From Swiss-Prot:
It comes from the Bacteria. The keyword Cytoplasm does not apply. NCBIfam families: ATP_synt_b. GO terms for cellular component: plasma membrane; proton-transporting ATP synthase complex. This is ATP synthase subunit b. The keyword Transport applies. GO terms for molecular function: proton-transporting ATP synthase activity, rotational mechanism; proton-transporting ATPase activity, rotational mechanism. Belongs to the ATPase B chain family. It is found in: Cell membrane. It comes from Bacillus cytotoxicus (strain DSM 22905 / CIP 110041 / 391-98 / NVH 391-98). Keywords: ATP synthesis, Cell membrane, CF(0), Hydrogen ion transport, Ion transport, Membrane, Transmembrane, Transmembrane helix, Transport. The chain crosses the membrane at residues 9-29.
Amino acid sequence: MPTLLLGAAIPFGTIAYTLVVFLILLVMLRKFAWGPLMGIMKEREEHVASEIDAAEKNHAEAKKLVEEQREMLKQSRVEAQELIERAKKQAEEQKDGIIAAAKEEAESIKTSAVQEIQREKEQAIATLQEQVASLSVQIASKVIEKELKEEDQVKLIRDYIKEVGEAR
């Protein structure tokens, strides 16, 4: 007669056989299913972790590159502003140089014109002195040639003044 376990109608041999088969199944599942499944899960976990690390590294590198680009853009703006300031300063210096050269040239032209006017004035004075001397000699020679009355003297002076006016 079969041995009963705890008064139940389950034979002890069946329980032992089921327990042995279950343990063998557990060992086989652990070896062929649980181990590879856990290995795959571990690989997947490591892969996901490495992907997260790579994404974090890429994100950090992208942030760094963005910051570098911002810094380069800022530097470019500063350099552009400096270039503009240098160009303005150079243009201002050129303007001042051109104005100074124009003033100097105007002063030179003015000085030259004043000298030319002075020469022409001196030449005109010299010419007038020669004409006055010549007229004086002519008047004196005519006076000597004839003795003049007051009326003749006035007429002679008017004639000579008229003659000098026509000569001009």
